[in-house]
Amino acid sequence: MHYVTPDLCDAYPELVQVVEPMFSNFGGRDAFGGEIVTIKCFEDNSLVKEQVDKDGKGKVLVVDGGGSLRRALLGDMLAEKAAKNGWEGIVVYGCIRDVDVIAQTELGVQALASHPMKTDKRGIGDLNVVVTFGGVTFRPGEFVYADNNGIIVSPQALNMPG
C-alpha cells in the first residue's frame, strides 16, 4: 500500500499525531506504514539485530536511540535482512549508516542522520515498551505511517481515502 501522510492527516485529523519534522528518508521505499514494534536502546543495536531476523510483515520497527548522533543503529546488512523478512520500514531516533546501499533496499527507513561508526553489541535495550520522541508517544500495537512529508502515529490502522 502506498501511503500519503497529508491525505491521512486530512481524512483522520482527530486520530493522528504528527512527529516533529526532524527525520530524513533514507530507504528505497519512500512511503511505508504498519503496526508499531518498539525498541529502546542507546548506542547498542543488539535488539535491532534480533528483531529484523523475525517476520515483520505489516510492521514498522520504531527504534528510540535517544537521539544519539554518535553511533549508527542500522546498517546495510540489517536493513537488507529486515526487507527480506517483510518489514515495512524502520524509524530510527538516531543515526544509520551505509546509506547508499539502504537507498537501494526495498524498505522504508527514516532516521535523524547518517554516521559511519557502528554500535557496540552488549545486549542492552528494551523491546515493546512505550517510547516518546519528536513530541509523539509510540505504543506497541498502534500504527505509524511515514513518507517524504513526515511521520504520523495513530491508535488504529488507517486506510488511504478513496
From Swiss-Prot:
Divalent metal cation. PANTHER family: 4-HYDROXY-4-METHYL-2-OXOGLUTARATE ALDOLASE 3-RELATED, REGULATOR OF RIBONUCLEASE ACTIVITY A. Catalyzes the aldol cleavage of 4-hydroxy-4-methyl-2-oxoglutarate (HMG) into 2 molecules of pyruvate. Also contains a secondary oxaloacetate (OAA) decarboxylase activity due to the common pyruvate enolate transition state formed following C-C bond cleavage in the retro-aldol and decarboxylation reactions. Keywords: Lyase, Metal-binding. Its cofactor is a divalent metal cation. It catalyses: 4-hydroxy-4-methyl-2-oxoglutarate = 2 pyruvate; oxaloacetate + H(+) = pyruvate + CO2. Homotrimer. Gene3D superfamilies: Ribonuclease E inhibitor RraA/RraA-like. One of its GO terms (molecular function) is oxaloacetate decarboxylase activity. The keyword Secreted does not apply. A divalent metal cation binds at residue 98. InterPro entries: RraA (IPR010203), RraA/RraA-like (IPR005493), RraA/RraA-like_sf (IPR036704). Substrate binds at residues 75-78, 97. The keyword Methyltransferase does not apply. Belongs to the class II aldolase/RraA-like family. It holds the Pfam family RraA-like. It comes from the Bacteria. Its EC number is 4.1.3.17, 4.1.1.112. GO terms for biological process: regulation of RNA metabolic process. This is Putative 4-hydroxy-4-methyl-2-oxoglutarate aldolase. It is an enzyme of class 4 (lyase).
